Amino acid sequence: MKALRIVFMGTPEFAVGILDAIAKQNKHEIVGVITAADKPAGRGQKIKYSAVKEYALKKELTLLQPTNLKDESFLLALKSLNANLHIVVAFRMLPKVVWAMPELGTFNLHASLLPNYRGAAPINWAIINGETKTGVTTFFIDDKIDTGAMILSKELEISESENLGDLHDKLMVLGCDAVLETLDKIAHGNVVTTIQEDTSDIKTAYKLDRDNCKIDFTKNITEVYNLIRGLSPYPSAWCNFRDADQEFSIKIYDTKQEVLLHDYTIGSVITTKKEIKIAVLGGFIQVLSLQFPGKKKMMAHELLNGLTFSEFAMVF
């Protein structure tokens, strides 16, 4: 078995789970960690460390935070770590000078069954598009985004009630297994790769923005439901709310479907003392939790304790 000297590259909590699994296995040496530069965040614009940086500091791992991956001083520091393998989990696109540096190459863990859902938000889009299965794939990085030769993939089912947060956590566990198995294959020199086949029906995991996170209530009930759960809890689906002379945007987090014929105007908000429902094509979306401007995320019944909606309330 070849001794692996690993540089790990990642930023969010998803990457921490993988890094921790490698460290706890204690088979290979983590010689360095690369993560995003510190950025101000929140209303106070206080400097916030990435989840991976927090972990690296706690474990006293060598840490690099380049702003430019082609910077000469960074490349010298990276080379001095003398790694023979780089691992990437939820980081950024690497220049060839970085991914081609180690003897054994650089592999990435991607949270989809490639070649489907290449891109920035694979977990979200699998749910938004109503997929019933997804998974993770490890592959060697090349000069394009998520197109390299695949090492292995692992699959799991998506239930109709799971949201982004639920699936994220399941895929992180599955991703740990995939990365450890990939490391074992590389260390023993028995990797067999598969080339990704490009076909016309490949689905893409587009970057999420304000426009594609907006709820379109003219779509059918299942599409509306899937969008909301695919964006919950982050970045969250949103829509405009209007009642009487007030109009503002709200976030919707958790919902249920009620398939039922009705004659309400699409987007009508129907309330009881404990429930909020929205009329959509093919039924009602029951809102379980939501957030109004200037308020924290609340359960629907909590919001209704202090707020009355008129019969003309609408979302759009």
From Swiss-Prot:
It is an enzyme of class 2 (transferase). The keyword Transferase applies. Coiled coil: none annotated. InterPro entries: Fmt (IPR005794), Formyl_trans_C (IPR005793), Formyl_transf_N (IPR002376), Formyl_transf_N_sf (IPR036477), Formyl_transferase-like_C_sf (IPR011034), Met-tRNA-FMT_C (IPR044135), Met-tRNA-FMT_N (IPR041711). One of its GO terms (cellular component) is cytosol. (6S)-5,6,7,8-tetrahydrofolate binds at S112, L113, L114, P115. Pfam families: Formyl_trans_C, Formyl_trans_N. The keyword Transferase applies. GO terms for molecular function: methionyl-tRNA formyltransferase activity. It catalyses: L-methionyl-tRNA(fMet) + (6R)-10-formyltetrahydrofolate = N-formyl-L-methionyl-tRNA(fMet) + (6S)-5,6,7,8-tetrahydrofolate + H(+). Keywords: Protein biosynthesis, Transferase. Its EC number is 2.1.2.9. Attaches a formyl group to the free amino group of methionyl-tRNA(fMet). The formyl group appears to play a dual role in the initiator identity of N-formylmethionyl-tRNA by promoting its recognition by IF2 and preventing the misappropriation of this tRNA by the elongation apparatus. Belongs to the Fmt family. This is Methionyl-tRNA formyltransferase. It comes from Flavobacterium psychrophilum (strain ATCC 49511 / DSM 21280 / CIP 103535 / JIP02/86). The lineage of its organism: Bacteria, Pseudomonadati, Bacteroidota, Flavobacteriia, Flavobacteriales. The gene is fmt.
